[in-house]
């Protein structure tokens, strides 16, 4: 009789983060159920046994069917307003249905399982900005949560549902709070709609790169493949991780002006043209306080618990992203 490998259910498998997690987990001897609204791209060199399932998880019964028999569930689904932004307004019920309601559905589905098997592990993609105004730049996860924006409030609400279910023995749940995740690798299958890749696109089009404020705001930027490795590694450490949130980051922050300048320089190497200008502009009306606070993430706790560390330096990640976009690969993504 063959070995029955664990079943990992990946929710949001065609998204920017989820597709990277799928590629990473596909290298493992596991069974994967890749769940998304549209069919997932199965890596050609996959070692895993992959089931592609299309579903609208907001439909009645869809979540229960998706997570049936799962040993581990990785929840990367997020509500994206329009085509490009995670920002949502107060009282956005459609966003709440996805960002909070799906977690509620997941927990109910697991709680209703027959039998007395071990509770499944659940890894949730949270956000470091859930903390709100911390009063300091370096965060390590011990700060009290006081989220300011609706997106962060909804993320925190979902996380609290998960951790309450962990305390009740329904799941073994952990929230991995992510900083700004960005970039492309040679096998990327989903668009990066964040600021870094947006600036790469602008530079390739010969447009100036608009910089809010004076450019001194620093960000801890995590390459998407490093973020994906964190979730794959988390599968092996559910017992150590469950019951709390964990911060992920590189431990190094970079001024956005320096990031934009480096993008302009790298694109110029491809185009043979002078680097595009980095220009200061007035922030848009939708900008909030978090857009002007520097963040550096101390992820020592997660590194110690899971043995993870980021492997791709910022400059190398930017270069991979520029190369992907300059080759026209991004334009072929759905």
What are the residue ranges of the model-derived segments?
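Substrate-binding strand-loop-helix patch
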Residues: 187-192, 215-228, 244-266, 312, ...
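N-terminal Rossmann NAD(P)H-binding glycine-rich loop of SDR-like oxidoreductase domains
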Residues: 8-28
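NAD(P)H-binding glycine-rich loop region in Rossmannoid oxidoreductase-like domains
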Residues: 54-98
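Active-site Tyr-X1-5-Lys
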Residues: 148-174, 204
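Amphipathic terminal alpha-helices
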Residues: 7, 313-334
């Amino acid at each position: 009789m063959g070995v029955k490998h664990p079943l990992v259910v990946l929710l949001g498998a065609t998204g920017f983060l989820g597709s990277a997690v799928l590629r990473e987990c596909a290298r493992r001897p596991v069974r994967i159920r890749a769940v998304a609204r549209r069919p997932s791209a199965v890596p050609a060199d996959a070692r895993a046994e992959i089931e592609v399932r299309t579903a609208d998880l907001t439909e009645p019964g869809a979540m229960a069917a998706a997570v049936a028999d799962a040993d581990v569930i990785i929840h990367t689904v997020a509500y994206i307003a329009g085509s490009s932004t995670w920002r949502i307004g107060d009282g956005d019920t459609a966003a709440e249905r996805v960002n909070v309601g799906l977690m509620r559905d997941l927990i109910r589905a697991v709680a209703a399982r027959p039998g007395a098997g071990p509770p499944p592990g659940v890894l949730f993609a949270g956000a470091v900005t859930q903390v709100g105004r911390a009063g300091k730049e370096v965060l390590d996860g011990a700060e009290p949560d006081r989220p300011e924006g609706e997106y962060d409030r909804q993320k925190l609400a979902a996380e609290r549902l998960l951790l309450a279910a962990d305390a009740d023995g329904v799941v073994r749940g952990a929230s991995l709070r992510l900083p700004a995740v960005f970039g492309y690798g040679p096998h990327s299958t989903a668009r990066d709609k964040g600021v870094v890749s947006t600036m790469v696109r602008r530079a390739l089009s010969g447009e100036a790169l608009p910089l809010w404020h004076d450019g001194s705001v620093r960000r801890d930027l995590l390459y998407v493949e490093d973020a994906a490795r964190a979730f794959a590694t988390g599968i092996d450490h559910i017992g150590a991780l469950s019951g709390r949130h964990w911060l992920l980051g590189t431990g190094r922050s970079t001024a956005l002006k320096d990031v934009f300048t480096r993008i302009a320089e790298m694109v110029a190497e491809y185009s043979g043209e002078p680097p595009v200008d980095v220009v200061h502009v007035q922030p848009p009306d939708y900008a909030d306080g978090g857009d002007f606070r520097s963040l550096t993430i101390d992820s020592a706790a997660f590194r110690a618990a899971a043995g993870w560390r980021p492997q791709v330096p910022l400059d190398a990640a930017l270069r991979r992203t520029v190369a992907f976009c300059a080759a026209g690969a991004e334009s072929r993504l759905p």
